[in-house]
Amino acid sequence: MQINTYPLDLPHFEATLAHKMRAFGSQVDRTIVTVDVRPPQSGRYKGDPKANRYMQSLETFRALYPVLESQYDNLSFHEVDYSAAEKRVVSDYFLGSEEMPDKAWDGGPFYCYFQGILEADSDYVLHMDADMLYGGMSQTWVDEAIALLQERDDLLFASPLPGPPHPGGLKGKHDGADHAFDEDEVDGRVAYRFHFVSTRIFLMDMKRFKERVGTLDLDTPRLSYRLRGLLLGNPIKALSAEQVLSLTLQKHGLGNMCFAGAGDGLYSLHPPFHYPAFHAALPGLIDRVERGDIPDGQRGDYDINDSLFDFSEMRQNHARHKRVTRRLMDFVTYWSARLKAS
């Protein structure tokens, strides 16, 4: 299991790591936590304009490494290696001769995903983001997913069901999104073969990647993305890692099978917002998810919604005009620093 995280995940990390170890610890050979130590300059992934909170959180995080490694078997922390030599190794494996950028056009994580996956050094890599939650708690899902990838040569990825199962199928943002997936079947139960993959959670067949794909293409972001990236001081070479991997599936006719598996199965849940009230409620929320105490309104939806936790306060803070204001502040901060440096 390979978990991507960064210092600003600190408020929830211990609770979500313990949850992941209960869900997957007995199903995997080892667990690598990949910590991105390079803060983005702008966008929704940054900490604050001077990166003070980011670096302070990193020092606190580093103090946790030995504590958590002593608590769990076969757990290790690895900070993302941005050295020129390691970047060449990662670039050669995933891109061939092209150099991999540190960040995506929007300042989001990019290189850290691929460096972590490669460092896992396994034929099958179970990758996930640090904040993901899981219900069903099947202890056989990983073995079933590997068997499925071995059986179906039209798949590059397998993933848990996106959201708790609903008799009417997928809901939330997937409701009616017929372009994104085809309904399928795994061991007699409904499954969904997606033409997309989320970097939040997947099991990847590394041998099939090299045999069927070889290397990834870095499709140039569209002009509006490149302009925004330039204005905010981000690299403009790559779309998000998720988009790059999804376009790869489509180009090569491969898929990502989302399925629950045997028994109570396994499904994923994604928290759309992070803030103190949510982090305070997280231990109780994790307990509910693990016990299967899920309201009907949450079923079929992969994002935690208000039926399970009330995010209305945070949604108001993420209103469009406030997001635009934050981007303008990012722009002013970045170019003020550039002008001072010159």
Residue ranges: model-predicted function:
Residues 9-12, 16, 212-342:
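C-terminal catalytic/acceptor-binding lobe
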Residues 125:
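Short aromatic/hydrophobic "clamp" motif used to bind/position activated sugar donors
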